[in-house]
Every structure is written in structure tokens, then in C-alpha cells.
């Protein structure tokens, strides 16, 4: 299955919540009508959604939020099941540990898609070595740096300025002048993906 390249607002409207697919430079309310489903008139059916349908929606939220396709998502779930602890929380921590997501959290990209592009264009170093695989998992203590040749890109500076105005997450440490950051640890569950019920995702894959 190919990666979705259509309108980003459409995905957020479908899930009824902000999936953080658009830059925060403008309020999402000015771009997307989250209370209206995609389509000419939206979906007005009052039919109750089945448990399976609700579980599927929660999975779709996570996949779309982090830009992950089904095959890769299943791998993350299998790894989360293999590890000790709460499977749903571990799944989200794995998604948060993806290189493209950490680049986004550090403010080098204004969206995960933009951060993924920086990685694929070899603009990012991980522990002093060029890293071009967006799905790489970052570990606590790993250092991420914008490569010298990419530091002149205006979009990176703009993204850093935007991140500084919004607030850098506490689980990463960033030196915006040097365009480098350290991944301190995976975030606490309460700090991320607050509109997602990951227990439903676990139930879906346990069917």
C-alpha cells in the first residue's frame, strides 16, 4: 500500500481530532472543520459504530498520526507485545522513538512529514553518522544533528522558531543554535497521543 499523499485535513476530519499532520503556523481551526466528516455533506448517519469499527478507528488514528503503513505498524505492535509492560503504552513509545518523529519533536521539521523528508534527504545525523531511514528507533542518549550542508535551509530555522514558541517536549533536549538535540527518554504516556485509546488497538489485534 502506498503512502497517503492527499489532503491532510481530510484525515484529521475523518478521525474527528487533530492528527498533527499540518504545521502549527496557523490554527488548525482555520484549516480543518474537525466536527464535519469528509464528503459533500459529511456523514450524518446515526447508526451506532460497532466495537470493531471503534477499534479500527483508533488504529487508523495512530497510523495516520505517525505516518506508518499497516505492515510496519504490525511490526511495532509485535515488538510491543514482546516487551515487558503495558502493550499499548509500549506501542506508542516505539512510535515516538522513530527517528522522523524525534526530528519532529526536536523542532527541526514543522510536521512529521517534513521531518521524514529531512531524514530521507540525508539532512540528519544520528550520533555523528548520516541517517536516512525514518523508521530507525532512537535510544535514550542518542544525539541528533542537522548536517552542516542543511543548516542553511530557511524551513529548518523557521521550524525551530515555531517549536520554541510552542514549547519543546521535556523528553528531548535541543540546542537550536547548533541545531542538535539529545533524546533523553521515551515520553510518558500522558504526554502524547492523548486523543487515542490504545487499549482498543490492543483489543483489535487480539481478536
Swiss-Prot record:
GO cellular component: small ribosomal subunit
Gene Ontology molecular functions: rRNA binding; structural constituent of ribosome
Gene3D superfamilies recorded: Ribosomal Protein S4 Delta 41, Chain A, domain 1, RNA-binding S4 domain
Keyword Transport set for record: no
Biological process terms in GO annotation: ribosomal small subunit biogenesis; translation
UniProt-listed Pfam families: Ribosomal_S4 (PF00163), S4 (PF01479)
Domain S4 RNA-binding: residue ranges: 97-160
Residue segments, region Disordered: 31-51
UniProt keyword annotations, A-Z: Ribonucleoprotein, Ribosomal protein, RNA-binding, rRNA-binding
Claim: Protein transport is one of the keywords in the record: no
InterPro entries attached to this UniProt entry: Ribosomal_uS4, Ribosomal_uS4_bac-type, Ribosomal_uS4_CS, Ribosomal_uS4_N, S4_RNA-bd, S4_RNA-bd_sf
Purpose: One of the primary rRNA binding proteins, it binds directly to 16S rRNA where it nucleates assembly of the body of the 30S subunit.
Similarity section: Belongs to the universal ribosomal protein uS4 family.
Assembly and interaction partners: Part of the 30S ribosomal subunit. Contacts protein S5. The interaction surface between S4 and S5 is involved in control of translational fidelity.
NCBIfam families referenced in this protein's UniProt entry, alphabetically: PRK05327.1 (NF003717), rpsD_bact (TIGR01017)
Protein known as: Small ribosomal subunit protein uS4
Species assigned in the record: Bordetella avium (strain 197N)
Amino acid at each position: 500500500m502506498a503512502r497517503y499523499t492527499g489532503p491532510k485535513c481530510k484525515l484529521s476530519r475523518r478521525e474527528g481530532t487533530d492528527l498533527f499532520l499540518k504545521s502549527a503556523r496557523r490554527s488548525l481551526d482555520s484549516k480543518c472543520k474537525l466536527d464535519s466528516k469528509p464528503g459533500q455533506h459529511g456523514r450524518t448517519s446515526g447508526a451506532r459504530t460497532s466495537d470493531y469499527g471503534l477499534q479500527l478507528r483508533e488504529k487508523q488514528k495512530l497510523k495516520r498520526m505517525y505516518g506508518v503503513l499497516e505492515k510496519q505498524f504490525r511490526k511495532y505492535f509485535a515488538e510491543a507485545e514482546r516487551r515487558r509492560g503495558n502493550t499499548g503504552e509500549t506501542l506508542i513509545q516505539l512510535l515516538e522513538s522513530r527517528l522522523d518523529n524525534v526530528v519532529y519533536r526536536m523542532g527541526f521539521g514543522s510536521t512529521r512529514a517534513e521531518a521524514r523528508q529531512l531524514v530521507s534527504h540525508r539532512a540528519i545525523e544520528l550520533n555523528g553518522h548520516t541517517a536516512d531511514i525514518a523508521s530507525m528507533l532512537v535510544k535514550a542518549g542518542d544525539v541528533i544533528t542537522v548536517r552542516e550542508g542543511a543548516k542553511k535551509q530557511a524551513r529548518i530555522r523557521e521550524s525551530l522558531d515555531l517549536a520554541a514558541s510552542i514549547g519543546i517536549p521535556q523528553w528531548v533536549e535541543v540546542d537550536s543554535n547548533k541545531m542538535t538535540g539529545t533524546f533523553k527518554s521515551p515520553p510518558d504516556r500522558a504526554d502524547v497521543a492523548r486523543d487515542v485509546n490504545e487499549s482498543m488497538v490492543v483489543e483489535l489485534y487480539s481478536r
